[in-house]
Regions:
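C-terminal beta-sandwich/jelly-roll accessory domains of carbohydrate-active enzymes
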Residues: 117-223
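Aromatic/acidic polysaccharide-binding cleft in carbohydrate-active enzymes
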Residues: 1-113, 117-129
Length: 223
């Protein structure tokens, strides 16, 4: 379809990157941002993955919806994120993302956990490029032991569109295929959660994030 990018990871990574910058804009202009919504619709009795601006197709969740599930897991006392970044909100608003990819993060803390969303977005939907190595250094963790879970939205994880294309893009999926698509459309763990030791309140997490990928780390404080 003409707007096939809305079916896959370009739309989901763009959503992560753009929503993160809304908070930067609000801070820059001293605005109390109480919430944000996405411009999405519901289209009934349409072809599968027709490229509409929606969160699901014929009841099957698309990757973009899993990014909103990630946002829903973030308890919002926002944490400061520092790093060697190629873009800020002003550069993106002036020139968009044309050169290096926009690799950045949004972090928050709740009573018993820290969550960090990492995204790797580019205006050119070239998903075949090499993943970007990312190192997260967390500080001031109030526990000596944590449980770390990583969720992922990319070409292989939490992506019903990839599953649909692997089926041959059927115009009328069977009930069995629909069941497979529904399962593929759920938010997936990248690996099994693991316990990690914290030293002097610090923890380092490493990942290789594919182009147009989004990762969410949930770091739960253990007693």
């Amino acid at each position: 379809p003409e707007n096939a990018y809305r079916n896959g990871t370009m739309y989901s990574s763009y959503t992560a990157a753009s929503f993160a910058r809304k908070y930067d804009l609000a801070k820059a202009y001293d605005i109390n941002l109480a919430g944000a919504v996405t411009w999405g619709f519901e289209f009934e009795d349409q072809q599968w993955y027709a490229g509409f601006r929606d969160m699901a197709t014929n009841g099957v969740d698309k990757p973009v919806l899993n990014v909103f599930r990630m946002f829903g897991m973030m308890e919002f006392n926002r944490l400061k994120v520092e790093g060697d970044f190629d873009y800020d909100y002003k550069k993106i608003s002036d020139a968009s993302v044309r050169d290096n990819p926009d690799v950045n993060a949004l972090a928050s803390r709740g009573e018993n956990a820290v969550t960090v969303m990492v995204f790797n977005y580019h205006d050119r939907n070239a998903i075949e490029v090499k993943p970007t190595p990312v190192t997260l250094n967390l500080e001031a963790i109030p526990s000596n032991k944590v449980l770390v879970s990583q969720y992922r939205v990319d070409e292989q994880f939490s992506n019903s569109y990839t599953a649909y294309k692997a089926m041959g893009s059927p115009k009328n999926p069977t009930l069995e295929q629909i069941d497979q698509l529904e399962q593929a459309g759920q938010l997936e763990l990248f690996t099994s959660p693991q316990y990690m030791q914290v030293k002097d309140g610090k923890l380092t997490l490493n990942l290789d994030l594919p182009r147009q990928g989004v990762a969410l780390f949930k770091v739960e404080f253990m007693p």
